């Protein structure tokens, strides 16, 4: 997790790291890239310090995490049954969760996988809404679930 990695240096707090990621972070260069002024602690002197971080610096710091995400998607696609692969090419991949909000992630994932990618209409709530749907419709959907006892 990028926020924890940055915070382990004690330069800034985890909340500040998350705010920076949301403000200027991206998965690829964007036309509206900007800088952010960050207040933290100098690691050498221990004194408060203000630095300016560029979108390119944040993108570089995020790149390992983004690359791992994309590699995981590619691994899943490589073992996807043909009939499901057809469906993916037609309907695409929907990104959910907080990480899906990283600017440029849908575009980069689509570029690297050649599969249409879009952001879920409610990315922060999509997983819990989907789980709720499965619970409400368990009888109709139970054939889709694996038996954990196997």
Language-model features, listed with the residues they occupy:
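Short, small-residue-biased leader/transition segments that mark boundaries at the very start
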Residues: 1-8, 70
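Short flexible coil/turn linkers enriched for glycine and charged/polar residues
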Residues: 30, 45, 87-89, 111-113
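Residue-level signature of catalytic and energy-coupling elements of molecular machines
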Residues: 73, 95, 131
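Conserved phosphate-binding/catalytic loops in two-lobed NTP-binding clefts
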Residues: 107-133, 141, 147-148
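Phosphate/ATP-binding catalytic cores across multiple sugar-kinase/actin-like superfamilies
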Residues: 61-89, 134-137
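Phosphate-binding glycine-rich/basic clefts of nucleotide- and phosphate-handling proteins
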Residues: 5-63, 78
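Interdomain boundary/hinge elements
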Residues: 11-15, 87, 121-123, 145-147
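Glycine-rich phosphate-binding loops at beta-strand->alpha-helix junctions
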Residues: 25, 85-109
């Amino acid at each position: 997790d990028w926020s924890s990695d940055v915070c382990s240096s004690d330069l800034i707090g985890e909340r500040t790291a998350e705010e920076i990621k949301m403000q200027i972070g991206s998965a690829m260069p964007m036309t509206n890239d900007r800088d952010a002024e960050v207040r933290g602690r100098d690691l050498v002197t221990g004194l408060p310090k203000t630095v300016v971080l560029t979108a390119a610096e944040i993108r570089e710091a995020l790149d390992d995490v983004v690359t791992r995400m994309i590699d995981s998607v590619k691994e899943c696609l490589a073992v996807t049954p043909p009939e499901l692969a057809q469906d993916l090419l037609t309907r695409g991949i929907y990104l959910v969760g907080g990480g899906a909000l990283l600017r440029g992630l849908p575009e980069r994932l689509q570029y690297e996988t050649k599969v249409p990618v879009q952001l879920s209409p409610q990315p922060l709530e999509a997983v819990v809404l989907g789980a709720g749907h499965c619970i409400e419709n368990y009888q109709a959907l139970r054939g889709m679930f694996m038996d954990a006892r196997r």
